[in-house]
A protein has these predicted regions:
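Active-site catalytic motif of lipid deacylating hydrolases and related acyltransferases
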Residues: 22-100, 203
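Serine-dependent carboxylesterase/thioesterase catalytic core
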Residues: 81-169
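C-terminal catalytic-base region of ester-bond hydrolases, centering on the histidine
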Residues: 152-232
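Bacterial N-terminal signal peptides
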Residues: 1-9
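Structural alpha-beta junctions
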Residues: 58-67, 123-130, 231
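Solvent-exposed, acidic/flexible segments
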Residues: 39-50, 69, 73, 107-114, ...
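Boundary at the C-terminal end of the N-terminal hydrophobic targeting segment
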Residues: 12-14
Length: 232
């Protein structure tokens, strides 16, 4: 099943900084929202929940939103640094780091990737307002680094499918609030269950693919993101 996750999409050419459309550096007080996709999904696949939400969030004043492939964490990190470099000197000052407003969300392997990215930002002294993981897959996707203010986790544990991370916890509970560890259920043979967009996903993706296709999940993710956008 893990092999299926990696092969479920056709491999595409790698994403680069020039594929990201947000203005750099970010305008003052703007929030940068980065969604990271699972599997080997293409960064601009319009059928993926990560991409759909990024495009929707772009319509919000004061928000810059991008979707990034999980193999491109380095690209995401460079983009964030470029976005925060308000004076263009390629060195982030204490003030430039302090003013960062960053939100990260990811699905499947993208859930693990956003925590890799958050840890890299932590090493650079860059704060993160929120991380949201959707059916996150990975060995290091349950400890939320101390630079993250709040975190939420959604998962499923149905039979014959990839299981998402069940419980995230804060490396430092005094600095990070865990908002949710919420389980979704997708029983087999339920007629009104979410339906993935392709036959391959419907046939072999199981509940992991159904969760990715569930609009209720993405409404929850969006709700947490919009709450974080109000944070001062």
């Amino acid at each position: 099943m893990v092999i299926f996750l990696l092969l479920v999409s056709v491999a595409a050419s790698g994403q680069s900084l020039r594929d990201l459309s947000s203005t750099t550096p970010l305008p003052p007080n703007n929030t940068l929202v980065i969604g990271i996709l699972g599997g080997i999904e293409h960064w601009n696949d319009p059928n993926r929940g990560i991409r759909k939400l990024a495009l929707k969030l772009r319509q919000t004043p004061g928000v810059s939103a991008e979707s990034i492939e999980n193999r491109r964490v380095g690209t995401a990190l460079r983009f964030i640094e470029k976005s925060l470099d308000t004076n263009g000197d390629r060195v982030l000052s204490t003030e430039e780091r302090r003013q960062a407003r960053i939100i990260l969300y990811g699905q499947s392997l993208g859930g693990q990737a956003i925590l890799r990215l958050a840890r890299a930002l932590n090493k650079r002294g860059i704060p993160v307002l929120l991380t949201v993981q959707v059916d996150s897959v990975g060995r290091t996707d349950h400890i939320i680094p101390s630079n993250v203010r709040a975190a939420a986790n959604f998962y499923q544990h149905e039979l014959l499918t990839v299981w998402g991370e069940t419980k995230i916890r804060a490396a430092d509970p005094q600095k990070t609030t865990i908002l949710a560890n919420r389980q979704f259920h997708y029983p087999p043979l339920v007629s009104d269950a979410p339906k993935p967009d392709t036959w391959v996903r419907r046939r072999f993706g199981g509940a992991h693919a159904r969760m990715e296709a569930d609009p209720i999940v993405w409404k929850e993710v969006e709700s947490y993101i919009r709450q974080a956008l109000k944070t001062k």
